[in-house]
Amino acid sequence: QPSKELEKSCLRVHYYPRLSGIRYFLRRTPYIVSTRTSKSMPENLLGDSFPVLFEGLHSTSMLARCVRARKKVLVRTHNIEHRYYHFLSVSEKNLFSKIFFRMEARKLERYEKILDQADHILAIAAHETGYFDQRYPPALFIPAFHKFDRVNGPTGSGDYLLFHGNLSVPENAKAFLDLAGTVLSRISYPVIVAGKAPPPWLLRRAGKDPHVTVIPDPDEDQMENLIRNAHIHLLYTAQSTGIKLKLLHALYAGRHCLVNRP
């Protein structure tokens, strides 16, 4: 998707198609890396002496070539990827997807060593900075950037509990399932579950409790209203990798948050 904000700030913006197919799954390089490359990348990245910032390990297919071209290289790490994919494999119900996530985790653990060639690692999570600094120094902690400059949560009380996230991600769907079995089925307070592409089994499970409502694929304005009007945000997770941007959103724009320490 073209980004108007980037185009306002940058001299040039190049867009590359995301590749797909079984042949990329069979490669030694992780699928999330090998499908994010293009024949035009060398021409665009190596034609000058400017530094290169790779946004996430998955974007680093050109890292080694940039290093050989004596360009300064920085990598913004979103999380410890192989741990994240391991947790996805544990949460996944579909057998093929479970195998994919497990194999991807192993490939990512091997591939991660490419970070040793970078000049700097810029970690998004304070609790993961030590991991990267010990293995691929130097690593710096730079917090997540977001649109908020002050806390602007509403006063008073809301009418429901809110659980939200990308529900197509196994980790998030599994978190709802855990909450439904241990908490939501024992209360009668209205609960709204909102997020992208909820799987059919999640809709069936939510339908067992009359006080639970699922709002699939809300647009940005609808999601913003749901966050602001909720009384309590249920922010449960089974893994501690990376940073939870939805927690930052709820803290700045919502009311009360119930969180856990994985």
Label the predicted regions.
Residues 101-151:
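Donor nucleotide-sugar binding/catalytic pocket of nucleotide-sugar-dependent glycosyltransferases
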Residues 227-242, 253-256:
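Acidic donor-binding loop of glycosyltransferase active sites
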Residues 69-91:
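Active-site proximal beta-strand in glycosyltransferases
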Residues 246-249, 256-261:
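Short hydrophobic beta-strand element within catalytic cores of glycosyltransferases
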Residues 39-46, 80-84, 92-121:
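Membrane-proximal helix-turn-helix segments that form the acceptor-binding/catalytic region
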Residues 11-42, 93-101:
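A short, charged, and often flexible helix/loop element on the N-terminal side
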Residues 43-61, 74:
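Short N-terminal targeting/anchoring amphipathic segment
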Residues 141-208, 212-228:
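Conserved catalytic-core segment of nucleotide-activated headgroup transferases in glycan assembly
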